[in-house]
Swiss-Prot record:
UniProt-listed GO biological process terms: methanogenesis, from carbon dioxide; methylation; one-carbon metabolic process
InterPro entries named in the record: THM_MeTrfase_su_C
Membrane topology term: Multi-pass membrane protein
Gene, per the UniProt record: mtrC
KW Transferase (keyword) present: yes
Native organism: Methanosarcina mazei (strain ATCC BAA-159 / DSM 3647 / Goe1 / Go1 / JCM 11833 / OCM 88) (Methanosarcina frisia)
Cellular component annotations (GO), alphabetically ordered: plasma membrane
Highest taxon in the source lineage: Archaea
Name recorded for this polypeptide: Tetrahydromethanopterin S-methyltransferase subunit C
Known role: Part of a complex that catalyzes the formation of methyl-coenzyme M and tetrahydromethanopterin from coenzyme M and methyl-tetrahydromethanopterin. This is an energy-conserving, sodium-ion translocating step.
Molecular function GO terms recorded: tetrahydromethanopterin S-methyltransferase activity
Amino acid sequence: MSAGGAGGEAKGAYPQQTLMALGIVGGLVGIYLGHFMPPAYSFFGGIGAICATVWGADAVRRVASYGLGTGVPSIGMLALGMGILAALFGLALGGIAGPILAVVVAAIIGGVIGALANKVIGMGIPIMEQAMIEISCAGTLVILGLSVVIAGSFDYAAIIENVIANGYIALIFIIGGMGILHPFNACLGPDESQDRTLILAVEKAAIALIITGFASSLHEGLMTAGINILVGLVIWYVAFSKYYALIKRDAYAVVGTGLLPSAEELQ
């Protein structure tokens, strides 16, 4: 089930500008490190994708708090759709500056779609344009980061051969989108908190790194794939442990329900 927020501005301890800097700087640094360093370090692309996922999840949290309803999953998928277009355009024309050009193109696409949503469709969400720019840019960085994990490079030819032509882009689309859209959907409620939502985004993005780590074995070898998977598992364990601790902090009670009763016991 998906739902929107309470119909107002989302509050949080982490400022929007800080998370934006984390997403843009962390995302680009991770992508470039994964590109320039030896294949064994392609996991840096995944770490960049994690930074971008946290930024995107916070942007979804802010815009969905105005009441998107079932649009919460849709906006996550839209982010990755815009991301694919911007990423391929940037890599095709930008060369070594491809990821930066891709982010610029994503911002333009996001701004146009946000304006259409407010001015034409009439959604009336005050931060829609800005949120769509952020979500589009975050989605682009997630696409690029996870592609670097698989291909070991953001070279356009390598991405086409190792990510697009073999269909791995569909895998990235789903797991990348889930990291951006799912955290707010899962944590939604009167006790939703920014730190719990964002640590869930880290956990989901770590799963994406693990999955793309498996996919990287086809092109980068088992050793590199093993490193990617190991790094993803470590980040996942730390994030999941923190998420569970925050659940216990925010919940009224955490109890074990035991096994479901049998039909005979219910009679």
